[in-house]
A protein has these predicted regions:
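C-terminal soluble interaction/assembly domains
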Residues: 419-420, 428
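Active/binding-pocket-proximal capping segment
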Residues: 385, 398-412
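Membrane-proximal, proline-rich intrinsically disordered regions
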Residues: 21-77, 416, 455-498
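Bilobed periplasmic-binding protein-like "clamshell/Venus-flytrap" ligand-binding domains
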Residues: 61-65, 434-451
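Sec-dependent bacterial lipoprotein signal peptides
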Residues: 1-19
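Active-site-proximal region of nucleotide-activated glycan assembly enzymes
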Residues: 389
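Structured, solvent-exposed acidic/aromatic patches
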Residues: 38-45, 84-383, 394-400, 425, ...
């Protein structure tokens, strides 16, 4: 059975997801509690104001999500601890994802899936009022804030749907236009991505046609004007198109002209809200980099300093490491000593495999780990610059792509030699900068980068299945991905990096 029928309002969809309730015998769309909760424009505005935080916490804040497992699955980070499915997703050789509802780490996909749909539900509820219900949101001075509220709801709607498409193989497309009295069929990730981009297009159009500034607490630390919201939506659209391919063939088929159009109107600033350790925080960054937890995989270390091994061999590896670099040295990336910290010991358990071992950790954002109140990025301007370069690579405009790369972090922060205007050098440099300069920023970034380059270790799931517990609720057959489960090269990797 590949369909599910909802007879409920948007909020009921989330109630089913969150409670695991198999019964659909609940209140209908005329539910007076819902009508009361969204009867006032101020209530709807308040929900819209919380959407940035709700989405950010789904991709950065949650320890119970897929960010950490994708990080180690991409061999960007490494950790032998069983927490957050990090050990299970980084086994060598790789193993299939256990998608049973009884799996101890099932909460990682369950929380991610439910959380994104919960945020989507809130967006849809706002849009149902301001677009379908013709509710007008008016500020105290009489300013019409309906376009602002609508734009934010469309932005987060697109991001929420988009990350379902980036992470999972399929899901349910539910927007403010969905007739929830009818059957909602499951859709493949490509259709989800397409819908998400259309949502972002609506946000972009609203931002171009209107002028507004969000309240300070909607995105702490950033004055989010209509221009900046529009830039964020453009970058988000480029991200979804660029990062969604599951292999090289898919990547070649991307509409790179469209990616370039979005990126050229994308971020001129870093989207990095200031944390308060109460409503805004990033457990993803914390558990990836706090002392004793995750470390940088030796693949990353070797990329910056080729004298180091790309894989930890055995106990004797400590005795064969080269002297560490602490000043600029030709052929070695300066960021190995500005953004990473050498460690003389490794806390991981030997019996779980030396392949987990590393001698470096990521230290660039250590100020957050000591104060918990600094800005933490999800999307950065340099990420948008790389999207511009990638679009030019595929036009091809090799000189233009090389110019962007040589004016950017590779040279200015890494101290590396400029790249030549060749397709191979440019492609390698984009891949490199996403792994090094954007290390541990946006959740899943390194995984998506490795995935579309066919470089994830053989057997690594290329996407995750709808959680088993949700399949049970939907009366759908359980399935999963990994070695022998799914289609090689489409559902699990048949490539690799070593």
């Amino acid at each position: 059975m590949k369909t599910i029928k909802y007879f409920l309002l948007f909020s009921t969809l989330v109630a089913v997801l969150l409670t695991g309730c198999e019964s659909l015998d609940v209140k209908n769309e005329n539910d007076p509690d819902f009508a009361t909760a969204f009867s006032k424009p101020s209530d709807v505005r308040g929900v819209a104001g919380s959407l940035f935080n709700s989405w950010y916490m789904q991709v950065q804040g949650g320890y119970e999500g897929v960010g950490l497992l994708m990080w180690v699955g991409a061999d960007a980070g490494t950790c032998s601890w069983g927490n957050a499915a990090m050990r299970d997703f980084s086994y060598e050789p790789r193993i299939a994802w256990d998608n049973t509802s009884s799996y101890p780490n099932a909460t990682q996909t369950v929380s991610q899936y439910r959380g994104l749909y919960s945020v989507l539900s809130s967006c849809n509820e706002v849009l149902a009022q301001v677009k379908l219900g013709d509710m007008q949101i008016t500020a105290g001075d009489g300013t019409d804030e309906t376009p602002m509220v609508t734009a934010i709801a469309k932005l987060i709607q697109g991001l929420s749907l988009g990350y379902v498409g980036l992470i999972f193989d399929k899901g349910f497309i539910v927007t403010e236009y969905t007739d929830l009295t009818q059957t909602v069929e499951v859709s493949p990730y490509k259709a989800i991505i397409d819908t998400a981009v259309k949502c972002l297009d609506e946000c972009i159009a609203l931002c171009a046609a209107n002028t507004f500034t969000l309240d300070d607490d909607w995105v702490p630390g950033i004055t989010m004007t209509s221009v900046k919201v529009g830039e964020l939506a453009n970058t988000a659209a480029a991200v979804l198109l660029s990062y969604s391919p599951r292999n090289k063939t898919d990547n070649a088929a991307v509409d790179w002209t469209k990616v370039g159009t979005y990126a050229n109107k994308g971020l001129t600033y870093d989207f990095a809200p200031v944390m308060d350790d109460i409503q805004w925080y990033t457990s993803y960054h914390t558990y990836a980099n706090y002392g004793g937890w995750g470390q940088a995989d030796m693949r990353i270390v070797n990329m910056m300093d080729p004298r180091f091994p790309s894989r930890w061999a055995d106990a004797n590896t400590w005795n064969t490491l080269p002297a560490i670099t602490t000043t600029h040295t030709a052929g070695i990336d300066d960021r190995i000593f500005t953004d990473f910290q050498f460690l003389a010991t490794c806390p991981f358990r030997v019996e779980r495999g030396y392949y987990h071992f590393s001698c470096y950790r990521f230290s660039r954002y250590d100020d957050y780990l000591s104060t918990w109140t600094t800005a933490q990025p999800q999307f950065r301007k340099v990420e948008n610059d790389l999207l511009k370069a990638e679009a030019l690579l595929h036009q091809p405009n090799l000189a233009g792509a090389a110019a962007i790369l040589n004016a950017g972090s590779r040279v200015t922060r890494g101290g590396l030699a400029p790249v030549g205007a060749t397709a191979t050098e440019i492609e390698n440099a984009i891949f490199y900068e996403r792994n090094i300069e954007l290390f541990c920023t946006g959740m899943g970034l390194e995984f998506f980068t490795m995935r579309k380059a066919d470089k994830l270790q053989a057997g690594t799931p290329l996407h995750l299945p709808i959680p088993g517990s949700q399949l049970e609720v939907n009366i759908m057959e359980n399935y999963s991905f990994g070695p022998g489960l799914g289609v090689a090269g489409q559902d699990y990797s048949n490539g690799g990096w070593f």
